[in-house]
Amino acid sequence: MLDAIQWDADLIRRYDLAGPRYTSYPTAVQFHDDIGPFDLLHALRDSRKARRPLSLYLHVPFCAHICYYCACNKVITKDRGRALPYLEKLEREIEIISRYIDRNQPIEQLHFGGGTPTFLSHDELRRLMQHLRQHFNLLDDDSGDYSIEIDPREADWSTMGLLRELGFNRVSLGVQDLDPEVQRAVNRLQTLEETRAIVEAARTLQFRSVNIDLIYGLPKQTPERFARTVAEVIALQPDRLSLFNYAHLPERFMPQRRISVDDLPSPADKLAMLQNSIEQLTRAGYRYIGMDHFALPDDELAIAQEEGTLQRNFQGYTTHGHCDLIGLGVSAISQIGDLYSQNDSDIASYQQTLGNGQLATRRGLHCNADDRLRRAVIQQLICHFELRFADIEQAHGMVFRDYFAALWPQLQQLDRDGLIELGAEGIQVRPAGRLLVRSLCMLFDRYLNDQVRQRFSRVI
């Protein structure tokens, strides 16, 4: 079966390396400061000429409480008044960007991320969605994939009703862990009842899909405690579930310095949590999509993987990878054709630049032919666990074995170790290699070296 996983502890220990999650290739680590607003506007014109469908990502950076594990770009504040000045600059960015696209380009996908998007008041959410509808071709028939990240502590039934009214049909809930001791250790107190209430509201209001995020490897977690959390989440029957590995990088993310290393689970316990979780989810009928994602068989991700159309971008696994992605807001990333661009990550600088009527594009890169080739290889492996050489050769005008000749001994070693099946026609990731597909993809990453690896989490 496509979703089958074989647990091999020895292989996992050998290939559990630090490396990218490949929501893009090249990864954001390679972005440079030579990319600016002109590059973005030129790419938008090309998108308009090609009439490509669009995906919008809006970043709302505010959180009322700090979660010690968090590595997101965020602003911690209880001052709700800080949202309005940011919203005004976000609206200005929307206005500028909209001049360079065709109003007939449909917005097939929309995602509000953060931070905590529901930090915005109901009136502010209404205002923002109205502004988007004025300047972009948002779909009115509920056929779009319109999602928002929700902190169950910051939402209630009225919030959910408003979101459904505004056109959102998918929600993603941050849960991470339901054990009170773990929650205290990461400063995120959230009851099962709060989470259940939001899931029930989503079902009653006919949201199309509910996703729940969990993290293993947090302080005070044990295999037994985390198994209880997974069981409680399974009982809520989310359509999708993300199971992230906590990466403790306190030298990069200041909030993580409040976590004591002594409270973190051992590598053996982390492996046990992952193994137990996979077994629990599999028994409950969830399919392994890849990396850290699971979905019910009738979910669009599972169907797309079955049909060979699943893709991956900055929003994770997606059925809309064919869309040009426009990122709006502080630190937001766009992927338009062969251009990656990112807005300023400092909120004060972002707001000042937009206040002057200019886009806040600060960095990015243009993909070359080699980038496009390697991106296609990584995309195929990470989404479908297989690669047909002929498809890549036809699309990119090369001979796979010759182009990647230097990698062949390493690929043969992966074959001997049981991670892949390397044949004359392609690569098939075996069940024992699916949890380690990132390690396979790293072979094709020409930018990766030991110094770069230190900036990423481990595979498991």
Language-model segments: which ranges?
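A short, conserved structural fragment
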Residues: 415-425
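Short, cationic-aromatic polyanion-contact patches
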Residues: 182, 306, 427-444
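Flexible, acidic/Gly-rich N-terminal and inter-domain linker regions that tether
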Residues: 1-54, 103
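Canonical Radical SAM [4Fe-4S] cluster-binding loop centered on the CxxxCxxC motif
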Residues: 52-87, 180
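Short, amphipathic alpha-helical interaction segments positioned at domain boundaries
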Residues: 434-460
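Short amphipathic alpha-helical interaction segments
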Residues: 400-413
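C-terminal scaffold of the Radical SAM
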Residues: 46, 76-99, 106-401, 455, ...
